[in-house]
């Protein structure tokens, strides 16, 4: 409304509207929500800073795990605060928008919206990382999980910067509160860090008065020398939640049934325990068994209870649990006998709870932050062959047999290391690429939907490693299938038997009816009459006697066949000869009872070890305390062959063609052993599966008979390998390096390879001829054969030529130059710069761990030192090289006898006398003492180390 005053024409008075009342953006009723949001952010920032600091330390020093159970209480608090604060934050944001949306400062509004959006994204990414069931899962290691994780970490920092800009439109920020918060958080973080060094479990843990020695003569130990509660090691069902497929495989594995839940082992270990009670008055010697077979019983401190029947005790049925294997923190060295350190694993909160809600909380923490779980239960050592060596390499200690301090038992590890599949440079055959570890063969990848599965091989499919450990043990699942306690797992046992059987038959070995030789009237063998079977089919003469040469060859096996429990594994060849009427005219290797039941013909060719006790009796019931010496060892090295000779007398009245058939058969447990196991149980000896690993058959005509035989070819390709395998088998007859093999026959076989002219046949022929000629002492011819193996096309592998050349040069050396040349060849094989590589530059073979070559280098250098003046600097330098080579060999095999002897020779020469320059003194003696302790097994080498150190000091 306006009016014009009559006293002042031309002027207008305007009444302005009353200004609107100021409304603050933060209403009084919003302040509690704001303060709650600030408080939540402060707590989230504090716990988040702690968690980020731990993650940073883990990233900077991956060899150390800084995460502890305390970390997860902070993580749980962080998640709980975040979830609890999400709704107030959303309510505050919505209300604040309603009160401030019409403000003229549009930039402040936009920044506020960005702060709110960032907060919402932080909440959503946090919820996603918690892996709640029903929501899309983010498996560890995926790109999606990484993106969401980093968004959750970075967004709060960005939100703070945006908030500072947003607050420029309002009251000034009171930075004093922020500084106070920072100070409190900093002090708190320091206090939290101090808690990382304290393990509350240690306060209540008990141990033996013997300390670490309690576990001897097993080489196992616990991290603190104390016992581990049995329940901490018996937690397989906990693992099943995220690793269901692995759990099912392990549940039917020989590892799971390694202990008193294994009837065969139970019989043997109970006998060993009874033997110890009678001989020693206690069962301590049988701890040697428990380190590998009964870890839960041993580490919980119960094993020495001599009167406990562990076959009826829960701990006796635990076997090698998931936690046992995955709680091993260290391998002491490749000495076997359970040479590992185990600790009680640290868990996320509520790992042992039976409350459903708390169990759910625990599961969510594992899924949300799996790094601690992975670091705790999966370490680099688990991927090494040395990890497997702890229980798949065995020596019998004097505490067990009261015989001597060392007697070799099974040894998969050294066999693998020295094989062409592993790190050996001296094999007859080499794969295109060596295997990195035992798991390459025995833990194949299999498709899985487990939460813990991942794309291991880059194929795009999620897989896990097979924890059934496919190998050969078809006998144990067959026994357990008959046990009422485990009969409900029948389908699983059938699958386990089938898996092991298929694994055995999958190109692991082959058998070849290679040739036939005639016999002279005086009973001697006419080697010149050797006729190779197929494509030629020589007729057999009625009334004549023949020698049938059968070759067994190991193929895709990285260790001796069979290794393991070679005294009770029942592996044999069955040979049958029948005429056209089906009449059996020759047979060897059959079972006593029909349908593959009962004992095997004792005159069969067994591929095992015939072990004896002190009285010359066979070790026939897995009684290790009585093992004394082997009578024979017919195992077949990896990538090698064995020849079995059958004598066949052809009847004069034989009809039609004769069919010869052979098959290599496998039964896990010797029948006599099973008789012992089931004696007194009231149960019959069960029929165990017999697996036909490989077979061969050929039909030959009979001279003077009207019989037609169809053409036949051998399935073995390339055909030249038949001659090569036969030669290898003849060379190795009697043992490697025994010089009592069929060397003349081997030379003939390798000569034949040269005449065949096939590409690879020629270099094999030359190289293997060199091996034979070396054994025969014809060193000049051997050297010429090695040279020829390098000039053919293709040539023999350079490392094999270097080995043979070095061997011959060292053996034939007459000058220092000869020994230098030999040492140079050995060093060339071992030099990392010379490792063979593929076209992409990736190493395919690494021979640096071939301790036979290392030992030969040490021996050659020692011989070379003898040509220098005693005590001269040059001699000491050469001896130092020999010591280094021997020490490297002992780092791979601490029990290598030639290297120990070689070191003693070197130390004796280095010792000199008291007037020599640089005598061996106390410092060197201390170094030797520590060296021997380090190379040996814990508790088992200290006395030897002290004795050697004393001897070296005396030399000085």
What function would you assign to each model-found segment?
Residues 2-207:
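Membrane-embedded alpha-helical bundles that constitute the cytochrome b-like, heme-associated redox core
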Residues 9-17, 141, 173-186, 197-230, ...:
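Primarily the internal scaffold of c-type cytochrome electron-transfer domains
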Residues 719, 760-762, 794-798, 836, ...:
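Residue-level recognition of tetratricopeptide repeat
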Residues 763-765, 797-801, 839, 853, ...:
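TPR alpha-solenoid repeat register
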């Amino acid at each position: 409304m306006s009016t014009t005053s009559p006293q002042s024409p031309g002027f207008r008075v305007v009444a302005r509207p009353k200004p609107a009342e100021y409304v603050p953006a933060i209403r009084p009723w919003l302040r509690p929500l704001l303060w709650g949001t600030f408080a939540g952010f402060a707590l989230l920032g504090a716990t988040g800073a702690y968690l980020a600091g731990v993650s940073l330390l883990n990233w900077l020093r991956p060899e150390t795990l800084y995460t502890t159970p305390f970390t997860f209480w902070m993580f749980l608090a962080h998640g709980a605060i975040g979830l609890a604060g999400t709704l107030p934050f959303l309510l505050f944001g919505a209300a604040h928008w309603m009160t401030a949306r019409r403000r003229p400062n549009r930039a402040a509004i936009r920044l506020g919206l960005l702060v709110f959006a960032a907060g919402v994204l932080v909440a959503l990414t946090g919820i996603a990382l918690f892996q709640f069931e029903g929501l899309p899962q983010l498996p560890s290691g995926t790109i999606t999980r990484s993106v969401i994780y980093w968004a959750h970490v970075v967004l709060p920092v960005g939100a703070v910067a945006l908030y500072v800009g947003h607050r420029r439109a309002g009251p000034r920020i009171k930075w004093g509160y922020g500084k106070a918060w920072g100070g409190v958080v900093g002090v708190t973080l320091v206090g939290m860090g101090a808690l990382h060094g304290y393990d509350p479990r240690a306060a209540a843990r008990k141990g033996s008065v013997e300390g670490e020695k309690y576990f001897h003569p097993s080489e196992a130990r616990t991290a603190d020398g104390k016992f581990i509660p049995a329940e901490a090691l018996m937690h397989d069902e906990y693992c099943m939640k995220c690793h269901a497929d692995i759990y099912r495989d392990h549940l039917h594995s020989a590892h799971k049934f390694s202990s008193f839940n294994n009837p065969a082992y139970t019989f043997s270990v109970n006998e060993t325990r009874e033997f110890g009670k009678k001989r020693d008055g206690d069962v301590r010697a049988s701890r040697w068994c428990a380190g590998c077979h009964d870890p839960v019983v041993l580490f919980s401190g119960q094993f020495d209870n001599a009167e406990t029947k562990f076959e009826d005790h829960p701990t006796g049925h635990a076997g090698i649990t998931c936690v046992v294997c995955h709680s091993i923190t260290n391998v002491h060295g490749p000495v076997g006998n359970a040479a590992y350190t185990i600790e009680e694993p640290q868990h996320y909160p509520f790992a042992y709870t039976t409350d459903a809600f708390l169990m759910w909380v625990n599961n969510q923490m594992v899924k949300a932050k799996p790094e601690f779980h992975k670091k705790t239960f999966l370490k680099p050592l688990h991927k090494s062959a040395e990890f497997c060596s702890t229980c798949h390499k065995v020596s019998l200690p004097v505490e067990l047999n009261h015989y001597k301090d060392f007697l070799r038992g099974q040894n998969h590890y050294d066999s693998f290391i020295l094989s062409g599949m592993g790190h050996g440079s001296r094999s007859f055959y080499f794969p295109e690429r060596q295997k990195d570890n035992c798991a390459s063969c025995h833990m194949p990848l299999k498709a899985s939907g487990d939460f813990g599965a991942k794309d291991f091989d880059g194929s795009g499919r999620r897989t896990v490693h097979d924890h059934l450990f496919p190998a050969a043990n078809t006998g144990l699942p067959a026994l357990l299938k008959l046990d009422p306690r485990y009969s409900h797992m029948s389908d699983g046992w059938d699958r386990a038997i089938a898996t092991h059987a298929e694994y055995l038959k999958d190109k692991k070995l082959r058998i070849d009816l290679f040739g036939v030789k005639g016999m002279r009237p005086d009973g001697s063998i006419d080697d010149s009459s050797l006729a190779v079977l197929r494509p030629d089919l020589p007729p057999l003469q009625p009334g004549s006697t023949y020698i049938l040469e059968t070759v067994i060859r190991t193929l895709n096996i990285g260790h001796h066949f069979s290794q393991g429990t070679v005294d009770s594994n029942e592996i044999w060849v069955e040979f049958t000869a029948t005429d056209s009427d089906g009449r059996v005219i020759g047979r060897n290797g059959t079972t006593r009872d029909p349908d593959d039941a009962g004992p095997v013909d004792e005159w069969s060719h067994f591929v095992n070890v015939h072990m004896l006790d002190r009285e010359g009796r066979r070790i026939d019931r897995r009684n290790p305390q009585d093992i004394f010496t082997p009578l024979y060892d017919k195992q077949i090295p990896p990538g090698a062959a064995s020849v079995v000779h059958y004598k066949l007398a052809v009847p004069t009245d034989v009809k039609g063609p004769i069919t010869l058939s052979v098959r290599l058969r496998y039964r896990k447990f010797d029948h006599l052993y099973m008789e012992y196991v089931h004696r007194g149980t009231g149960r019959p000896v069960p029929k165990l599966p017999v697996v036909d690993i490989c077979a061969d058959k050929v039909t030959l005509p009979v001279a003077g008979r009207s019989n037609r035989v169809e053409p036949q070819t051998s399935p073995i390709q390339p055909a030249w390998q038949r001659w090569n395998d036969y030669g290898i088998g003849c060379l190795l007859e009697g043992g490697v390096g025994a010089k009592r093999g069929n060397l003349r026959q081997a030379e003939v076989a390798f000569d034949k390879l040269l005449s065949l002219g096939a590409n690879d046949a020629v270099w094999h022929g030359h190289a293997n001829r060199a091996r034979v000629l070396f054994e025969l002492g014809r060193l000049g011819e051997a050297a010429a054969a090695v040279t020829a193996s390098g000039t053919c096309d293709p040539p023999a592998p350079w490392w094999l030529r270097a080995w043979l050349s070095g061997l011959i040069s060292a053996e034939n050396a007459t000058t220092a130059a000869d020994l230098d040349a030999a040492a140079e060849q050995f060093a060339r094989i071992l030099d990392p710069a010379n490792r063979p590589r593929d076209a992409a530059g990736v190493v395919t073979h690494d021979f640096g761990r071939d301790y036979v070559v290392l030992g030969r280098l040490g021996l050659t250098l020692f011989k070379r030192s003898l040509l220098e003046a005693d005590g001269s600097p040059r001699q000491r330098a050469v001896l130092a090289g020999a010591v280094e080579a021997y020490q490297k060999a002992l780092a791979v095999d601490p029990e290598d006898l030639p290297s120990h002897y070689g070191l003693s020779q070197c130390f004796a020469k280095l010792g000199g006398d008291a007037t020599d320059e640089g005598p061996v003194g106390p410092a060197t003696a201390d170094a030797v003492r520590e060296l021997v302790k380090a190379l040996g097994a814990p508790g088992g080498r200290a006395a030897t180390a002290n004795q050697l150190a004393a001897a070296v000091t005396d030399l000085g």
